[in-house]
C-alpha cells in the first residue's frame, strides 16, 4: 500500500485560502434601474402587449424614487457589505434546497464516460479500483490545497476563478428536509476526515475502508476488497431491502421516511456511514442491453428504475461513480454543492489518472489479511416497507416519463463557427432559439448558465438567450412570404449573436438580472407583510419558468453531460461543441403532448445546417455547401447516438 503522510484535519478557513491568495472581488450589486430596464427588455417580446403594459406600470411603481425597490436595494447593499456573496444563500435555497422534486432527472445531472469493454467482472472491478485510486489522489491534492487555480476561458478570459466549489466535491451531503433540504459539509476539526467509500452492489451498501493504519490501499488491495463485496452481495440469503430507493423519492417524502429510519440505532449507524463517506461507487448490473449513448445516459440519469439499477444509488451524496458490468460508466452528481464545470474538471483528472497510472506513490507490501468490507444493515418497519413501495412506483414513473436523446450533429463544429468570427456558444444558442421557434412559432424564457466564479463564492447567473435580436432573426428565417434577402438574414444573425455575447459578458461580470431580482424578492419576504406586486405579476412568474434550460459543458476527453427539463412542458438542452461536431443531449417529458425530444433535436440539426448555409453564402470558401441529404436529415437519419 502507498504510505500516506498523516495530515491533521483541515480547519474550514483553510479551504478558503485560495480566495485569500487570489484576493477575488465581491460580487457587485447592479444598479436598480438598469436591472428593471433589462428585465422589461427581456420580456417585452415574449408576452402579449396588454400584459406587458400592465407589467411596465408595476415595474415603474416598484422602481419609483423613494419606493419599495429603492428600499430593498439599500438593504441589498448593506447585505453586500456584511457577506462574502450577497446572493449565494438565496440562490442555493431557490435553485436546489427548497425544491421538493425527486433528484433523479429533475435535479441531478450525469456525466457519461466512453463505453468500456469489460470482458468479465474482474475487468469491471479493476476499472472501479483504478477509479477509486484516482479519487484518493485527487482528494489528497484538495486536502493539501495543491489543486491549481482555474482561469477564465472564452469571454473576458485570463481572470482567476473562485475554487471553493472543489472543496465540496468529497465533503458534501444533501440532507432531506420536510420543507427545505440542508447542504451539510464535513468541516469539523474534531471528527476525523472520512476514510471510507460506500460501494453499492445489488442494491446493497458496503463500507470500503480506503485507509488502514494510516496507509492508503493500493489498486490491488482495492480490487481484492471489491471482489469480496461482489461475493457478499451475491449471497441472496443476506440481502436486505433496497433502501437506496428512498433517496430517489420527492425530498419531503424521503425526509419523512428518513425520520422513521432514524428511530432504530442500526439504521442510524448505517446512515451515518453513508453521510460521511468520501463518495459512492455503484457496481451496476447490466442495463437494457442497448449500449448507445442515449441508453447509457439513461442508466446514469435514473438507473432504469427499480428493476434494473435505479435502487443501486444514494442520490443525496454529491458524487456517485457508476461502473456497470456492461461497460456503462460515469458519474451522477448531486448538483447543489458545485457546478458542472467543476465536476468535469474533477472527472477528467480521474480519467487521466486511470489512463496514465500514478507511478509516484511508494508501494509497500499489502497487509497479510485486509479486514473484510462491512455490509450496512437496515431494520425495516412496516412503515418503511410502505415508503419503499411508494418510492419504487414513483421512480418507475420518472423512468417512463423521460423523453431523452443524445444527438451528435456532425456536419460541422466550432472550427467552422470560429471561421465566421462568431462565438461558438452564441451561435449554438441562436440555433436553439431558431429550432424552438420553428416548432412552436414563439420564443420562451430561456436559461443558460453563466459562471460568476470571478467573484468570491460565485456560482452562476442566467444568460437570457431569447433576446429581441434572436426573435428578429428567427422570424426572418421562417417567414417565407417576406422574401428576406440572405444578406439581411446574415446581418440579423450577426446581431443576434452579438446580443447573446453582450448579455454573456453582462452575466459573467455580475450585471445580469436574475440573481439581483431573486435577492430583492427574498429581502422583501422579511420586510413586507404581503409579497410585492412586482414578484406576483404574471410576467415575472413567467420569466422564471424556463421552458428552455440550456448549458454548454465542454470536455477535452470522450464524455458528455446531460440532465432533465426544469418544467413539465420544457426541454433540457446540454451541448458539448467539438472541433468538427456538436453533441446535444435533449430531454423533455412524455407527459407533455406538446414536446418531443426527437423533433426538437431534428429542428436543432436543421437550424444549424441552415445557419451554415447562410454563412457559406457569404464565404463559400470556408465550408463546402451542404448536400440535400445533409439539409434534410435529422437525428433519426443522422447520428442518433
From Swiss-Prot:
It catalyses: choline + acetyl-CoA = acetylcholine + CoA. The active site is at 335 (proton acceptor). Keywords: Acyltransferase, Neurotransmitter biosynthesis, Phosphoprotein, Transferase. GO terms for biological process: adult walking behavior; chemical synaptic transmission; dendrite development; establishment of synaptic specificity at neuromuscular junction; muscle organ development; neuromuscular synaptic transmission; neuron differentiation; rhythmic behavior. Gene3D superfamilies: Chloramphenicol acetyltransferase-like domain, Choline/Carnitine o-acyltransferase, domain 2. CoA binds at residues 413-425, 451, 552. Its EC number is 2.3.1.6. Belongs to the carnitine/choline acetyltransferase family. This is Choline O-acetyltransferase. It comes from Mus musculus. The gene is Chat.
Amino acid at each position: 500500500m502507498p504510505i500516506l503522510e498523516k495530515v491533521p484535519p483541515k480547519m474550514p478557513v483553510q479551504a478558503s485560502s485560495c480566495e485569500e491568495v487570489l484576493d477575488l472581488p465581491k460580487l457587485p450589486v447592479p444598479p436598480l434601474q438598469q436591472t428593471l430596464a433589462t428585465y422589461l427588455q427581456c420580456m417585452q417580446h415574449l408576452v402579449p402587449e396588454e400584459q406587458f403594459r400592465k407589467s411596465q406600470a408595476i415595474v415603474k411603481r416598484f422602481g419609483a424614487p423613494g419606493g419599495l425597490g429603492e428600499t430593498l436595494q439599500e438593504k441589498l447593499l448593506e447585505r453586500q457589505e456584511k457577506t462574502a456573496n450577497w446572493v449565494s444563500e438565496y440562490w442555493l435555497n431557490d435553485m436546489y434546497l427548497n425544491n421538493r422534486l425527486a433528484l433523479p432527472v429533475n435535479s441531478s445531472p450525469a456525466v457519461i464516460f466512453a463505453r468500456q469493454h469489460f470482458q468479465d467482472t474482474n475487468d469491471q472491478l479493476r476499472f472501479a479500483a483504478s477509479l477509486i485510486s484516482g479519487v484518493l489522489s485527487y482528494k489528497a491534492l484538495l486536502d493539501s490545497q495543491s489543486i491549481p487555480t482555474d482561469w477564465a476561458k472564452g469571454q473576458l478570459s485570463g481572470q482567476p476563478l473562485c475554487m471553493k466549489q472543489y472543496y465540496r466535491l468529497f465533503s458534501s451531503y444533501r440532507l432531506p428536509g420536510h420543507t427545505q433540504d440542508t447542504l451539510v459539509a464535513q468541516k469539523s476539526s474534531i471528527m476525523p476526515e472520512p476514510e471510507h467509500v460506500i460501494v453499492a452492489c445489488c442494491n446493497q451498501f458496503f463500507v470500503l475502508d480506503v485507509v488502514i493504519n494510516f496507509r492508503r490501499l493500493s489498486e490491488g488491495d482495492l480490487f481484492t476488497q471489491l471482489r469480496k463485496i461482489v461475493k457478499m452481495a451475491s449471497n441472496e440469503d443476506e440481502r436486505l431491502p433496497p433502501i437506496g430507493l428512498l433517496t430517489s423519492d420527492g425530498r419531503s417524502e424521503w425526509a419523512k421516511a428518513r425520520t422513521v429510519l432514524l428511530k432504530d440505532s442500526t439504521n442510524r449507524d448505517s446512515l451515518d456511514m453513508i453521510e460521511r463517506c468520501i463518495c459512492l461507487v455503484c457496481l451496476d448490473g447490466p442495463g437494457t442491453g442497448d449500449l448507445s449513448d442515449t441508453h447509457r445516459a439513461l442508466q446514469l440519469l435514473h438507473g432504469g428504475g427499480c428493476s434494473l439499477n435505479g435502487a443501486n444509488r444514494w442520490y443525496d451524496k454529491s458524487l456517485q461513480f457508476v461502473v456497470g458490468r456492461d461497460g456503462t460508466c460515469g458519474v451522477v452528481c448531486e448538483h447543489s454543492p458545485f457546478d458542472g464545470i467543476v465536476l468535469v474538471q474533477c472527472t477528467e483528472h480521474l480519467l487521466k489518472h486511470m489512463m496514465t497510472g500514478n507511478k509516484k506513490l511508494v508501494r509497500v507490501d499489502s497487509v497479510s489479511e485486509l479486514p473484510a468490507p462491512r455490509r450496512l444493515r437496515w431494520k425495516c418497519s412496516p412503515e418503511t416497507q410502505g415508503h419503499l413501495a411508494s418510492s419504487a412506483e414513483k421512480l418507475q414513473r420518472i423512468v417512463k416519463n423521460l423523453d431523452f436523446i443524445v444527438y451528435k450533429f456532425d456536419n460541422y463544429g466550432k472550427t467552422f463557427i470560429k471561421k465566421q468570427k462568431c462565438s461558438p456558444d452564441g451561435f449554438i444558442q441562436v440555433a436553439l432559439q431558431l429550432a424552438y421557434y420553428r416548432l412552436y412559432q414563439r420564443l420562451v424564457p430561456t436559461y443558460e448558465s453563466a459562471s460568476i466564479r470571478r467573484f468570491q463564492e460565485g456560482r452562476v447567473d442566467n444568460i437570457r438567450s431569447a433576446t429581441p435580436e434572436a426573435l428578429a432573426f428567427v422570424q426572418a428565417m421562417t417567414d417565407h412570404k417576406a422574401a428576406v434577402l440572405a444578406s439581411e438574414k446574415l446581418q440579423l444573425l450577426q446581431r443576434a449573436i452579438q446580443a447573446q455575447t453582450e448579455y454573456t459578458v453582462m452575466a459573467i461580470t455580475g450585471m445580469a438580472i436574475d440573481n439581483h431580482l431573486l435577492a430583492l424578492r427574498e429581502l422583501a419576504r422579511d420586510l413586507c407583510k404581503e409579497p410585492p406586486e412586482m414578484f406576483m405579476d404574471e410576467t415575472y412568474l413567467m420569466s422564471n419558468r424556463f421552458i428552455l434550460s440550456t448549458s454548454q459543458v465542454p470536455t477535452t476527453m470522450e464524455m458528455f453531460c446531460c440532465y432533465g427539463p426544469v418544467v413539465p412542458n420544457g426541454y433540457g438542452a446540454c451541448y458539448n461543441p467539438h472541433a468538427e461536431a456538436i453533441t446535444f443531449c435533449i430531454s423533455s417529458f412524455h407527459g407533455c403532448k406538446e414536446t418531443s425530444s426527437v423533433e426538437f433535436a431534428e429542428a436543432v440539426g436543421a437550424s444549424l445546417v441552415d445557419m451554415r448555409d447562410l454563412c457559406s453564402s457569404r464565404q463559400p470558401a470556408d465550408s463546402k455547401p451542404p448536400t440535400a441529404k445533409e439539409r434534410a436529415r435529422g437525428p433519426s437519419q443522422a447520428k442518433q447516438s
